[in-house]
Curated annotation (Swiss-Prot):
It is a peripheral membrane protein. GO terms for molecular function: ATP binding; proton-transporting ATP synthase activity, rotational mechanism. The keyword Transferase does not apply. It comes from Oleidesulfovibrio alaskensis (strain ATCC BAA-1058 / DSM 17464 / G20) (Desulfovibrio alaskensis). InterPro entries: ATP_F1_dsu/esu_C_sf, ATP_synth_F1_dsu/esu, ATP_synth_F1_dsu/esu_N, ATP_synth_F1_esu_C, ATPsynth_dsu/esu_N. It holds the Pfam family ATP-synt_DE. GO terms for cellular component: plasma membrane; proton-transporting ATP synthase complex. Its main location: membrane. Keywords: ATP synthesis, Cell inner membrane, Cell membrane, CF(1), Hydrogen ion transport, Ion transport, Membrane, Transport. It is found in: Cell inner membrane. This is ATP synthase epsilon chain. It comes from the Bacteria.
Length: 134
């Protein structure tokens, strides 16, 4: 039996991460799920949030913004709309995005797309959470 699995995080622009890991925890659409080596195959929609993985006794974090996770043959493939490793997150940029989203939500509701503003706020908060966890 395998003792590790391959984790790949891919966006439309690039491969964010490709690494052998011991465990993956991801923000599924219906709630967080975890994957250990030799897990049964499955496919899950992802929500905006924190993905974490363990390798060599260390826990590392990444931000994912929606997409899908595929688990098959000791490989976890994350196909995300956007993703960043914790160490690559620009805290100042995330804080500014949070501030812009909060200001849009406070504006008159008729003049904004509240759903888009809420999603932007959720992305900014998740990025900050991931960066602070690292």
């Amino acid at each position: 039996m395998e003792k590790s699995l391959q984790l790949e995080i891919v966006t439309p622009d690039k491969v964010v991460l490709s690494e052998q890991v011991d465990y993956v925890g991801a923000p599924g659409y219906e709630g967080e799920f975890g994957v250990l080596p030799n897990h049964i195959p499955f496919l899950s929609a992802l929500s905006i949030g924190s993905l974490y993985y363990k390798a060599g006794g260390k826990t590392r974090y990444a931000f994912v913004s929606g997409g899908f996770a595929e688990v098959s043959d000791n490989k976890v493939t994350i196909l995300a709309e956007s993703a960043e490793r914790a160490e690559d997150i620009d805290i100042e940029r995330a804080r500014k995005a949070q501030q812009r989203a909060e200001e849009r939500l406070k504006a008159e509701r008729e003049k904004i797309d509240a759903t888009r503003a809420e999603a932007a706020l959720k992305r900014a908060l998740a990025r900050l959470q991931v960066r602070n966890a690292a």
